[in-house]
Amino acid sequence: MRYIKTTMHYCLIVSRQALRLSWVFMALFLIACSSTPKDSSKRSDGKNIDDSITATGEGGIPAGFDVDAPNENPYLADKSDGPSGARSLFNNAISAMQQENWQRAEVLLQQLTTEYPKLSGPFLNLGIVYHKLDRKEDAETAFNNAIKANSLNLDAYNQLGLLLREEGRFNDAEAQYKKAIAVWPKHAASHKNIGILYDLYMGELNKALNHFEIFQYLQPEPDRQMAGWIIDLKRRIGN
């Protein structure tokens, strides 16, 4: 099995926005099996991927992409501080997660969610802890609570989508990724995750290609691995 790990907002220093941001410990956004598109350096026609790495995005805007959507993640746009009384507790929870002391992290995060139920980040991280402990039902509840606390928390939708995908609930996972994209159409990770879901688990290759191309379009510089995935997917579709 091939693991593609993305650490999102994982920080050891609690900043002014620490309790508002969705700190994620080793967020496994993209866990794909060996059928993940090959990251080869050659196309079937013998050309290097580098020769076509900008093929998606430069020739036009991907279908269905909202170019007029805000450029800033709406969850991060809120610059308000979190409660000062929770910062030390949250920092200790993050430290416990770094040390993989899941039981201590659980206790600290449960305390945070009890004392500060309007904060989304602690619920999100509690869900990640439960996921690590293979307590999937508890993890699902925590991720849903994170979304309830702040419906703009894109990481929570994606973590929930990952969990549901692992359980074989592909339609439910799809719904979570779609919700994240509805919140912010320019969230690249959501497009990548739903693309993987469509490609590897639901057999919706054209939909997967569309979201992969949107992901690539959103990159400041073309992503070489994604370019390889797009080429492989087009080959399988017959484009």
Positions of predicted regions on the chain:
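Canonical tetratricopeptide repeat
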Residues: 125, 159, 193, 228-229
